From Swiss-Prot:
Disulfide bonds: none annotated. One of its GO terms (biological process) is transition between fast and slow fiber. The gene is Tnnt1. Gene3D superfamilies: 1.20.5.350. Keywords: Muscle protein, Phosphoprotein. The modification Phosphoserine is found at residue 2. Residues 1-62, 109-153 are annotated as: Disordered. Belongs to the troponin T family. It comes from Mus musculus (Mouse). Residues 1-31 have a biased composition (Acidic residues). Interacts with TPM3. Troponin T is the tropomyosin-binding subunit of troponin, the thin filament regulatory complex which confers calcium-sensitivity to striated muscle actomyosin ATPase activity. This is Troponin T, slow skeletal muscle.
C-alpha cells in the first residue's frame, strides 16, 4: 500500500471515530413541559457503521507481490499445459511414424508375396505347357505305333490269326500287371500334406493348387477313358473280322462226299 492510500485510510478511520463519539454523546435535558406535550416516539436501533479492520503499523499488504505471485502461478500453469500439449503431440507423431512404418512394411510384404505367387504361377504354367507338349508327343508317337500295328495286323490277318489271339491273351495278362503298376504309381504320387506350418495365404494357395491338380487329373482320366473305349471298339472290330475269316477258311478246308460207297 502506498503512503497516500495509507493517509486516506487513516483519515477515514478518524472521521468514523468522530461520528461514533457524536452519536454516543449524552443529549441535553429538554424542558419538562415540552416532553409532556410531545408524544413518546419509538426508539430506533442504532446501527454502528462498518469499520474495516485495522492493519497493524508494522505489517503492510504488498499488492504488487500478490499480483506477481498470481502471475507466476498462471505462468506456471500455462507452461505446464504447453508441456503436456507438446508431449501429447510428440507421442502422436511417434505413433503416426510407427503406423506409417507398419503400413510400408506390410505393403512390402504383400508385394513380395505377390511377386512370389506370380513367379510360382509362371513356373506352374510353364510346367503344365511342357507336360502338355510331352503328352501330345507321346500320344502322337503312340498313335503312329498303333496305326502301324493295325496295318500289320490287317495285312497278316489271314496267316497269323492265332498269334493275334495269343497277343490278346497277353494283353489281358498285362492288364493285371498294369493294375499293379497303377497302384504302385499311385502310392508313389500320393504325398503327405504338411499343412501344420502353413498360414492362411499358404493354405489358400495349396487348396488352389490341389483343385487345379484334381481338375487336370479328371481331364486326363476322361481322355484315357475315351481312348480305352476306342481301343476296345477297334479290338472288337478286328476280332470279328478274324472270326469271320476263320469261318470261311474252315468251310473251304472241308470236302463234301456225295453218293454212297458200296
Amino acid at each position: 500500500m502506498s503512503d497516500t492510500e495509507e493517509q486516506e485510510y487513516e483519515e477515514e478511520q478518524a472521521e468514523d471515530e468522530e461520528a461514533v463519539e457524536e452519536e454516543e454523546a449524552p443529549e441535553e435535558p429538554e424542558p419538562v413541559a415540552e416532553r409532556e406535550e410531545e408524544r413518546p416516539k419509538p426508539s430506533r436501533p442504532v446501527v454502528p457503521p462498518l469499520i474495516p479492520p485495522k492493519i497493524p503499523e508494522g505489517e503492510r499488504v504488498d499488492f504488487d507481490d500478490i499480483h506477481r505471485k498470481r502471475m507466476e502461478k498462471d505462468l506456471l500453469e500455462l507452461q505446464t499445459l504447453i508441456d503436456v500439449h507438446f508431449e501429447q503431440r510428440k507421442k502422436e507423431e511417434e505413433e503416426l511414424i510407427a503406423l506409417k512404418d507398419r503400413i510400408e512394411r506390410r505393403r512390402a510384404e504383400r508385394a513380395e508375396q505377390q511377386r512370389f505367387r506370380t513367379e510360382k504361377e509362371r513356373e506352374r504354367q510353364a510346367k503344365l505347357a511342357e507336360e502338355k507338349m510331352r503328352k501330345e508327343e507321346e500320344e502322337a508317337k503312340k498313335r503312329a505305333e498303333d496305326d502301324a500295328k493295325k496295318k500289320k495286323v490287317l495285312s497278316n490277318m489271314g496267316a497269323h490269326f492265332g498269334g493275334y489271339l495269343v497277343k490278346a491273351e497277353q494283353k489281358r495278362g498285362k492288364r493285371q500287371t498294369g493294375r499293379e503298376m497303377k497302384l504302385r504309381i499311385l502310392s508313389e504320387r500320393k504325398k503327405p500334406l504338411n499343412i501344420d506350418y502353413m498360414g492362411e495365404d499358404q493354405l489358400r494357395e495349396k487348396a488352389q493348387e490341389l483343385s487345379e491338380w484334381i481338375h487336370q487329373l479328371e481331364s486326363e482320366k476322361f481322355d484315357l477313358m475315351e481312348k480305352l473305349k476306342q481301343q476296345k471298339y477297334e479290338i472288337n472290330v478286328l476280332y470279328n473280322r478274324i472270326s469271320h475269316a476263320q469261318k470261311f477258311r474252315k468251310g473251304a478246308g472241308k470236302g463234301r462226299v456225295g453218293g454212297r460207297w458200296k
